[in-house]
C-alpha cells in the first residue's frame, strides 16, 4: 500500500498474567522461569536506570508483582553495568491473526556499549532472558531464554568481538546496557519485571543528555516494514524503530528522545481501504497523545492514565502525520479543510502541553496530496505566535525499492534522518551546533 498502512490484524489477546499461569507455584516460579538467578535483583526504576519513552507501571492482581511496560516503539531503559552476569525478566503477549494464524510478537533490541548485539522476540507470559550470560557468553546457546516447552527465543545475534570481555571469575566487566522496544504496542506488549545480576554487580543510570526531542507519528516513525522487502508480508520482525528516521535523527544529535507513534493513525482518520468511504476514528493521535498509553490500558481493562507532560520536557517536538488521513480525504475539499483545522488544533494543544518546545512539522515522503494543507496550517499557526516550522520531505521516487507494504526502506529512512538532522541543527540547535553532529 504505497500511501497508507496495513490494518492491525484481527485477533484476541490474553493478559500476560493469564498466559503465565501454571497449575502450581505460579507466583514463585512463573511459566518460563524454572529458577530465579541467585544474586541481586533490580527494579526497573529511575533510581537504577535511565528510562526513556512513555511507560506504564502495573501491579499484577495474581502475582502482586510490579511490571514497567514500555509503551511506544523506541522506548528503552539504559544503565551502566558492572558485574559478571545480567538477565531480565519480561512479561509479554502477542496478537494473532484469526485468518491465517500469523503471530506478531514484541521484538526487543539489546545494545552493549552502544553497539547492537541482538534482536529477539518475546514469548507470551513471563520469561527470563539472558542479556550478559556469565562464562559461556560467547556461545549462541547462552542467549536462549528459559522455556519449559523447549522453544528457544534466540533471535538475531550480532557479532561483537569483545562481548564476553575477560571470562576470569576474578574480573568484573563494565559496560553500558540498553534494552529497547522495537515494535508497537498494538501488536504486543513488553513489561519489565526485574533485572538479575551476580551478587557483586552494580547498576546505575546513565547520564541524561542536554538535548531532548519528542517525535509524534505513524508507521513511518515506527519503522514499519523497514527491515523487510517489497515482496515480504509485514511482521513485527520487519519493524524497527531504531532503523527509522526519528531514532536515527535523535542519536545523530546525541539527544534523549521519546516516540508517540502508531501505525495507521491520523488526525481525523486512520488508514481506510479505497472501497471504504467513512473515516476510521477509533484511535486518533489528538486523543491518544493525552494518555500514557490508552491502547494498552484498554486492552487489559485498566483505567487510562493521563500523561504527565512535566516528566519529559523536549526542546523540539517533531510531528509526522497526514499520510493516513489522505486515504480518507482523497483530494475532497471539505475533508481536506477539516483535516487542516484539526491539524492546527492539535498543534496548538501540543504547544500548550509543551510551552518551551519548538515544533517541527514534517511530511511528504509517502504522500504529497495533503502537503499544501500541512504547509498552510504551519503558516497560520506561525502567524498566530505558535513556534512552529515546516520541513518538507523528499518524496520516494517511482520505482524505488521499499520495505514492506510500500513503506520507506532502511536507506530511505536514513536519508530522511540526515535531512531532518541538518534541518534541526540549522533551525533549532544553532547555538550548540558542533561540526561532528552528523549521521556517521
Walk through the language-model features, giving the residues of each.
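Conserved, well-ordered alpha-helix/loop/beta-strand core segments that scaffold catalytic motifs
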Residues: 320-322, 347-349, 359-361, 367-370, ...
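N-terminal secretory targeting modules
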Residues: 1-4, 31-143, 149, 154, ...
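Generic structural signal for well-ordered alpha-helices
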Residues: 343-347, 375
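Catalytic His-Asp segment of secreted/periplasmic serine-dependent ester chemistry enzymes
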Residues: 365-440
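Conserved SGNH/GDSL esterase-like catalytic core that processes O-acyl groups on lipids
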Residues: 226, 231-333, 337, 365-375, ...
